[in-house]
Amino acid sequence: MSEADPRGIDPELYEYLEAAQELDEISVAEAARREQSAQAAQAAAEEEDRQAIRALVEGSLLAGSGDLDEVLSGLEGDVDADWEGQADQPDHSHQGEGQPGEADSHRQALARAAYEQGVRERLAQVEAEILSRAPEHKVQPSLERLELALDYLGNPQKTFKAVHITGTNGKTSTSRMVERLAAATGMRTGRFTSPHLHTIRERIALDGEPISAEGFIAAWEDVAPVIELVDAHSAKNGGPRMSFFEVLTVMAYTVFADYPVDVAIVEVGMGGRWDATNVLDQATAVITPIGRDHERWLGSTIGEIAYEKSGIIKPGATVIAAAQPEEAQAQILQAVADNRALLRQDVSGYVSFDARMDLEAESLARENGGLAVASRQFAVGGQMLTLVTAAAVYEDVFLPLHGQYQAHNALLALAAAESLFGGRALPAQIVENAFAQVTSPGRLEVVRTSPTVLVDAAHNPHGVSALRTALEESFPLKHLVLVYAAMADKDVEGVLSELEPICEAVVCVPMDSPRAMELDDLVEIADDVFGSDRVRSATNLVDAVDLAAQLAESSDDPLPASGVLILGSVVLAAQARELFGLKK
């Protein structure tokens, strides 16, 4: 080979010129060995690419991917064709400002697929670790572990304003409304709710959106060393590890402080007094309607349950309360007095469509710091409201949710949002824009038409009673069939008794949860309430919905008169939403 300066020679020829020179000095056998080594390296690289593509497909990142082997074969054929077509063409892969060539695009796609697969695997590991702890329905009457963990972390819960929400029903919907109102004013928001529908990440939301997978993983890794310390401290004193819900609460408060949020909207897990969330100072306390639920842990009477829930009221706090049963009201008033708190309470009763609260009563409510739903009108996709607070009257507010109970949830949310600004009225346009954006997945949600299929997460008689009123008001279906499953600790007879007058039949179905009631037990109770001639069962949700639709459509009435209601649990609501392609 000439010693002349090689500049001017195509750089891609360097390795071939050098290889030719080396062949003068080494044996043919050695050259063959090197060629085999190069081929092996290339084969390994191709296999690595194939595995990355497999991860991409298996992870469902390619929509409608179909059969895995067929997709892989097709992708490999496409890649081979791409490279064959480029074999005799100049390399333009790096031409153009900031525009990657096709080769780079392939590499980037494969790298992204591998990265996302790694994130999914790590998220599954983190979730498994958290879920290995005591479940959230096993209340541990102590805040010591949580307070110790937060103290180690610098008490992140003290860095933001908070709205703390308890009650038996309506907590999540109210939380979502408060968050939208706060966000509409320009505040950075955090939201902590439970349980989740589709992913554990829903429980911790920033600016209305679930925390990212990477963010959830990072939050766990930030607090894990502290959780380990607290577990060890508790074990040393004969106590339990931190529970599933305690860990999530610590993660949420840490995320909110790091983001940082201006306000956190925090829903209690269960009860209030001993709930892990109850370490917030000077939070606005919201108490939605109280009824019987979780009686094993909270008490067997409304008064006992209300006592536990009123435990979130802190000295000097503003308390926003729904209208309550007499026993619950007594407990709330006592807690307000003990803490010298300011009470703003819903004083309006049920307001039917096209009716308006008496103007004198409306004025009296405002003068006494009361709250009221002054009027409701039916609207396509929801309802139009007039809401009265101590600060203002808000007219022509569109709420894209059904049911009078959602109107009252909106009233509580509005008063809570006002409390963040010293009780002052919010601009009407902000209120209208915020409520128009509200969603509440799995709460009287229409997932299909023809026939109408509704999904609701209601699981206790108190919530189902409110739902029944909303159904009769907004969905006047002549032929409604219920698809039902429930957790074993729920009042199944009470729930079915509420729905029996408006449902022609019930289809019982098993549910994917270790806490679910056995199908045979469910059918037995349904037989007692509906009569065996109106009870059916199916082994899976797909068949249950199909059977329910057939039963609902069996009459000669027009199709809009028929419907299916899927109800009984958040778990069932999630499975139903996924069945109809809804995961957000």
Locate each region found by the language model.
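Short functional linear segments
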Residues: 1-167, 174-185, 192, 232-239
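Acidic, Mg2+-coordinating active-site environments of NTP-dependent enzymes
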Residues: 7-27, 34-35, 45-50, 56-59, ...
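ATP-dependent carboxylate-amine ligase catalytic core
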Residues: 118, 137, 143, 147-151, ...
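Short Gly/Thr/Asp-enriched flexible loops that form oxyanion-binding sites at enzyme active sites
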Residues: 178, 273-283, 577-580
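Glycine-rich phosphate-binding loop signature in dinucleotide/nucleotide-binding domains
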Residues: 256-262, 423, 474-478, 548-563
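Nucleotide phosphate-binding/pyrophosphate-handling subdomain across enzymes
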Residues: 263-266, 275-286, 290-292, 304, ...
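C-terminal helical cap/extension that packs against the catalytic core
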Residues: 325-343, 452-454, 461, 496-562
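Active-site-proximal loop/hinge segments that shape catalytic or ion-binding/gating pockets
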Residues: 569
